[in-house]
Amino acid sequence: MKFEPELESGKLIKRYKRFLADIKLDDNSERTIHCANTGAMTGCAEPDSTVFFSTSSNLKRKYPNSWELSVTENNHTICVNTLRSNQLVVEAIQDQNIKELTEYDELKTEVKYGSENSRIDILLTGKSLPDCYIEVKSVTLLSESGQGFFPDAVTTRGQKHLRELSEMAQLGHKAILFFAVLHSGIEKVSIAHHIDQQYHSLLIDAIENGVNILCYQAEMSSKEMKIVRKLPFSI
């Protein structure tokens, strides 16, 4: 995924109202940018940290700039735009960069499924293959020694998705929970049972029901983002 034009940068002043952030540019002018991430953003939104933003060509947008990346004091890069994770995984599958998913012929997104009226992030189909339901989750919470965690806050929506994936697996389909790691400092991923015990419990049940876990990390810069490596996962 290439950023065209290349992302611009500034210094974070503050994030507020969940969807907005004020930044200071190199010329000391200030600008309000849109923040697509409504989560806790723990460690991703420290005042005076460097942020990178894109500019929309949509002239009707009230805030044409979108917060894409943050750089931490340890020089780690984090993608804070939650819309990017699905786009990255779709691109990686289409480019045959996810070795576990190269046999499928057709890819669809946002398809209705399940008994709880959800929409699956990605549905793969192929001749003589079980349908493959993929739910994508972005991982940006870093603890010590390279340990990444998901979720970074209690997620009832995520719990619902686990129940839906379990249902698909029990019906004989392939069901995958795909962790897209969008923090350059993360070396391995685990479930944050200390944050959301119910999610942890539901994932154990989902795995027992046949849900598979994939965990891949992206490389990120002001010019592009792409899925590049598989990371270890533990429950």
Swiss-Prot record:
Q: Which Pfam families match?
A: SfsA, SfsA_N
| Molecular function GO terms recorded | DNA binding
* Cleavable signal peptide: none
Could you name the domain of life of the organism this protein comes from?
Bacteria
Family stated for the protein in its record? Belongs to the SfsA family.
Protein name, as recorded: Sugar fermentation stimulation protein homolog
Species in which this protein is naturally found: Aliivibrio fischeri (strain ATCC 700601 / ES114) (Vibrio fischeri)
Q: Which gene encodes it?
A: sfsA
